[in-house]
């Protein structure tokens, strides 16, 4: 289960609509807790993928990931997951998403159109990396 506030969910949705028709991306910051992950902050990142691929791929560079991890540590937080958008596509992980994900983390995907965010779901990867499972979202 992932626990997240309305404010953070709205930030993800707004980022997705703002970056449409390209995929947006960012980090989910908070804590790993006994009851699951608790998100207290989002950390938006610019999609570093080349222009021709941004419509269906995102890239977080190692430098940006380190910046985000440093930002989290300075606030006594952890990276508990990632988010990205699927412009004009369902909010379900692609095969590419599966191949590039890491177990343990949450992956929030929001489906966007030019003027609105649609479905938003969270996913967790199996430890053997074979597939994603839907993750319950608790909104606070």
Residue ranges, per PLM feature:
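Conserved beta-strand-loop surface patch within small alpha/beta domains used
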Residues: 1-79, 87-140
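Conserved, mostly hydrophobic/aromatic
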Residues: 82
